[in-house]
């Protein structure tokens, strides 16, 4: 999915971002989405949409259904944000998040989808940057993606918060 510039006066900058004169910065992000459940992947893509916020635009999605595919894709360094399903099987997104954070140099920010609101401590253990509990709330999910999308290219650490 290729995105068009935010405005006719937008100019691309290195790192996949586009800055527009007068409007501030539009963060264009590529997202890797991991879940073994196609319905969960569809729900996430629909909830986030193409523009989760005025200043954040999803330029591409890559869906993965297996942990080895995620690891291979993340090692390529082509993604700005990872969304991992904590309820995926046989490898859950929480354990996969911890593995990626410990093994991948400069791992992109990670948003984990937890099974319930009380699983925030698991998200903290996994070293996730943000967590959104199920059932998925489209506003919370889009907000979390936008928050992490704004950190792309900066050293701002968000910390493991439940959104």
What annotation goes with each model-predicted range?
Residues 27-49, 82:
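Conserved acidic segment of CheY-like receiver
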Residues 43, 136-145:
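C-terminal output helix
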Residues 63-81:
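Acidic, metal-coordinating helix/loop segments flanking the phosphotransfer/catalytic sites
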Residues 80-101:
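Conserved phosphotransfer microenvironments
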Residues 81, 129-132, 138:
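Conserved phosphoryl-transfer motifs of two-component systems
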Residues 104-109:
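His-Asp phosphorelay/catalytic-motif detector in bacterial-type signaling
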Residues 115-131:
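Alpha4 helix (beta4-alpha4-beta5 surface) of REC/receiver domains from two-component response regulators
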Residues 152-163:
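CheY-like receiver
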């Amino acid at each position: 999915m290729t995105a068009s510039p935010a405005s006719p006066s937008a100019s691309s900058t290195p790192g996949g971002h586009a800055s527009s004169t007068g409007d501030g910065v539009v963060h264009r992000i590529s997202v890797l989405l991991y879940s073994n459940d196609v319905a969960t992947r569809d729900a996430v893509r629909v909830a986030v949409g193409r523009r989760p916020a005025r200043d954040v635009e999803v330029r591409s999605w890559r869906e993965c259904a297996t942990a080895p595919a995620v690891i291979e894709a993340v090692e390529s360094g082509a993604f700005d944000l990872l969304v991992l399903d904590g309820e995926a099987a046989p490898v859950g997104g929480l354990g996969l998040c911890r593995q990626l954070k410990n093994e991948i140099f400069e791992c992109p920010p990670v948003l984990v989808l937890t099974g319930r609101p009380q699983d925030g401590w698991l998200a903290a253990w996994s070293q996730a940057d943000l967590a959104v509990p199920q059932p998925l709330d489209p506003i919370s999910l889009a907000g979390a993606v936008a928050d992490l999308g704004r950190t792309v290219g900066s050293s701002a650490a968000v910390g493991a918060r439940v959104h």
